[in-house]
């Protein structure tokens, strides 16, 4: 049972949400009085409460979603809130649906989407993973952060071939190394206000670090927003090469580190928007003609479930007609299907851009 002080804070937060008439978050939409009353006293076995779930969305009324999972159990215990939010965000992943088993499919079905190198600047595929037996950020102790980091760094140091590289802990990082990682766009910063409010940045920078291979085409973030973010990327449009590298890395890491998986929701992550496959496949792409015809761009994006962002990711502008375009769907389909949908959409956008020239 949650403590009285926690429940008092929850009541206060609920009032704040109710009063915020211009708040458009999914939290506000689905945290009805009856759901609130049903959940406000509950506590996971690791001690997480509804407050841990909603505090970021209460503090930041401009959140799009507004909830995070403090641990794996939260997705089950607070399902009356999470399930409708998940269904709404992952369009059509109903509360009775079950995410399919992991399936990377035939990796040779993926191609270079821009062999002439005229449109795609770079290609990236990432996934998130949580380590079994550990809660998510808000519930982690300093000792757990250290323990996880040592497991991750020893696992990664065993990688061979193209994946062979170096692990750089954020703790005690020299200015030179730091600058080099910033120049390569590899370094992650302490979380934004949404993550800060969710208590995702405690004991910073303990337990956080970055691994990259010698070619700088493979990257792992340890204990940023998720326990692990596994990233494969390179300049140009060779999605096939990028995807194959990611798949072999995930398979190698999984042999040594068991991942948190949920029968219904797939791979578990801190933020419910990343659940399921957790896969985000994206390109930085120059589409000057389509940039001038935003309506057409959005129409094609909608047809292939693509998300169009500005050059520097979420909440940014497209600089010089360069967009960050990725698959939007992560749940209710396989990894293969998610990336294939993105490939089909990008090929279509390039075809239309050429026709408009």
UniProtKB/Swiss-Prot annotation:
Q: List the disulfide bonds.
A: 201-271
Q: In which tissues is it expressed?
A: Expressed in chela muscle (at protein level). Expressed in muscle.
Q: Does the keyword Kinase apply?
A: yes
Where does the record place the Phosphagen kinase N-terminal domain?
9-91
- Judged by the first EC level, this protein's enzyme class is transferase
Gene3D superfamilies, per database record: ATP:guanido phosphotransferase, N-terminal domain (1.10.135.10), Glutamine synthetase/guanido kinase, catalytic domain (3.30.590.10)
Give the record's GO biological process terms. phosphocreatine biosynthetic process
Every Phosphagen kinase C-terminal domain range: 119-356
Respond yes or no to whether keyword Chaperone is given for this record: no
Listed A to Z, the keywords are: Allergen, ATP-binding, Disulfide bond, Kinase, Nucleotide-binding, Transferase
Binding residues annotated for L-arginine, in chain numbering: 64-68, 225, 271, 314
Q: Name one Pfam family in it.
A: ATP-gua_Ptrans
Q: Catalyzes what? A: L-arginine + ATP = N(omega)-phospho-L-arginine + ADP + H(+)
One Gene Ontology term, aspect cellular component: extracellular space
Its domain of life reads Eukaryota
Residue numbers binding ATP: 122-126, 185, 229, 280-284, 309-314
Q: One MF term from GO for this chain?
A: arginine kinase activity
Which range is the signal sequence, renumbered to this chain?
A: none
Q: What is its EC number?
A: 2.7.3.3
Instruction: Report the protein's function.
Output: Catalyzes the reversible transfer of high energy ATP gamma-phosphate group to L-arginine.
Query: Which family does the UniProt entry place this protein in?
Result: Belongs to the ATP:guanido phosphotransferase family.
Full protein name = Arginine kinase Cal b 2.0101
């Amino acid at each position: 049972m949650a403590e009285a002080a926690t429940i008092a804070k929850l009541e206060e937060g609920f009032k704040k949400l109710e009063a915020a008439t211009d708040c458009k978050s999914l939290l506000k939409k689905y945290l009805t009085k009856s759901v609130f009353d049903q959940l406000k006293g509950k506590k996971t076995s690791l001690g997480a409460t509804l407050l841990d779930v909603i505090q970021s969305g209460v503090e930041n009324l401009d959140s799009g979603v507004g909830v995070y999972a403090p641990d794996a159990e939260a997705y089950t215990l607070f399902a009356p809130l999470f399930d409708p939010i998940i269904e709404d965000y992952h369009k059509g992943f109903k509360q009775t649906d079950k995410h399919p088993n992991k399936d990377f499919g035939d990796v040779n079905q993926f191609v270079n989407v821009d062999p002439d190198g005229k449109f795609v600047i770079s290609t990236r595929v990432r996934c998130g993973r949580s380590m079994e037996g550990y809660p998510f950020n808000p519930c982690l102790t300093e000792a757990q952060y250290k323990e996880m980091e040592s497991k991750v760094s020893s696992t990664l140091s065993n990688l061979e071939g193209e994946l062979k590289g170096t692990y750089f802990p954020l703790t005690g990082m020299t200015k030179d190394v730091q600058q080099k990682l910033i120049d390569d766009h590899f370094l992650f910063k302490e979380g934004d206000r949404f993550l800060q409010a969710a208590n995702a940045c405690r004991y910073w920078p303990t337990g956080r670090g970055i691994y990259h291979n010698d070619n700088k085409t493979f990257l792992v973030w340890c204990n940023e927003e998720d326990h692990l973010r596994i990233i494969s990327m390179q300049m140009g449009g060779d999605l096939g090469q990028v995807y194959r590298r990611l798949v072999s890395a995930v398979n190698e890491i999984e042999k040594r580190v068991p991942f948190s998986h949920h029968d219904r929701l797939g791979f578990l992550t801190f933020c419910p928007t990343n659940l399921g496959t957790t896969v985000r496949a994206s390109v930085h792409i120059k589409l000057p003609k389509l940039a001038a015809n935003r309506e057409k761009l959005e129409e094609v994006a909608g047809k292939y479930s693509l998300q169009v962002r500005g050059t520097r990711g979420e909440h940014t502008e497209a600089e010089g007609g360069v967009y960050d375009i990725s698959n939007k769907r992560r749940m209710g389909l396989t990894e293969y299907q998610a990336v294939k949908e993105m490939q089909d959409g990008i090929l279509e956008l390039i075809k239309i851009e050429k026709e408009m020239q």
